[in-house]
A protein has these predicted regions:
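N-terminal subdomain of nucleotide-sugar transferases
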Residues: 1-53
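A nucleotide-sugar donor-handling region in carbohydrate enzymes
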Residues: 169-245
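Conserved nucleotide-sugar phosphate-binding/catalytic loop shared by glycosyltransferases and other
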Residues: 33-82, 160-163
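Generic beta-sheet signal
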Residues: 35-37, 54, 133-135, 209, ...
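Alpha-helical membrane-targeting segments
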Residues: 80-84, 146-187
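Conserved nucleotide-sugar donor-interacting segment of glycosyltransferase catalytic cores
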Residues: 88-160, 213-214
Length: 245
């Protein structure tokens, strides 16, 4: 039996598929612990997973839902600035609180949501193997794939590939302050530097709930990238178990 930890955003759209994966691992005899802010506990209360609270001082009960409500009222640059500040705060919290909690829980392997960019660095710091889980659209970048936040159509022509790359450059520029938090933490922990965003994804395995038939044609998919792994039997639900960590 392995002790498997989960790091993922508190949004239900990320928690549901991640819990589905965790439940299947439970069925196979492993212990699964999800590390999250206080209000995540209620959201996964019928998942059978164990829960370890982190980040309560930064994100008290109700703060995540309040954040999403505020974000829903914003548009354009104001919305982007608000989201960036939230993700910077979340990243700093994870770097501060998650390592000790994961150590105390004696975790053997981490499942990390693809958008939890701090997760790979935490795993590297703890010398733990980790798997990247794409609970939303895969955001792996390559010239032929339009940026995930656009409505651009796929076209296998030079100008579309140039457009896609410019879109990715713009995204990296606008979110550079989030990336800087990760880069700085790797320096503090004396870890090898990451030069591009995809460096934070696992080289052991990346798994996606999106079937290949529904994704854009990818030319640079890693051999450790796996798709459509969500065909699980429906388990019997019980109450969540809180653990000390």
């Amino acid at each position: 039996m392995s002790r498997i930890g989960i790091l993922c955003p508190g949004a239900i759209g990320h928690l549901n598929p991640m819990c589905n994966l965790g439940i299947e691992l439970l069925r196979r005899g492993h212990k699964v612990i999800l590390f999250g802010v206080p209000e995540v506990e209620e959201k996964i209360s019928q998942s059978n997973l164990e829960f370890c609270e982190i980040g309560g001082s930064d994100f008290p009960l109700g703060s995540i839902e309040t954040m999403y409500a505020q974000l829903g009222q914003l548009t354009g640059l104001e919305g982007l600035k608000f989201a960036i500040q939230f993700f910077k705060k979340e990243g700093n919290m994870l770097f501060r609180d998650a390592p000790n909690a994961i150590r105390n829980a004696q975790i053997d392997l981490l499942l990390i949501d693809q958008v939890t960019s701090a997760g790979g660095t935490i795993a590297d710091y703890l010398n733990l193997p980790f798997i990247t889980v794409c609970n939303a659209l895969p955001i792996n970048k390559e010239p032929g794939v339009p940026p995930y936040f656009t409505h651009w159509r796929y076209k296998d022509v030079w100008w579309a590939k140039l457009r896609n790359q410019l879109g990715n450059v713009l995204t990296n520029y606008l979110t550079r302050s989030i990336w800087d938090v990760l880069v700085q933490q790797r320096k503090i922990w004396h870890l090898p530097p990451h030069y591009k965003r995809d460096d934070s994804y696992s080289k052991l395995a990346q798994i996606s709930q999106l079937p290949q038939e529904l994704d854009f044609p990818r030319q640079k998919i890693a051999p450790w990238f796996h798709v459509d792994v969500a065909n699980y039997k429906k388990p019997a639900f019980h109450n969540i178990k809180r653990v000390d960590c």
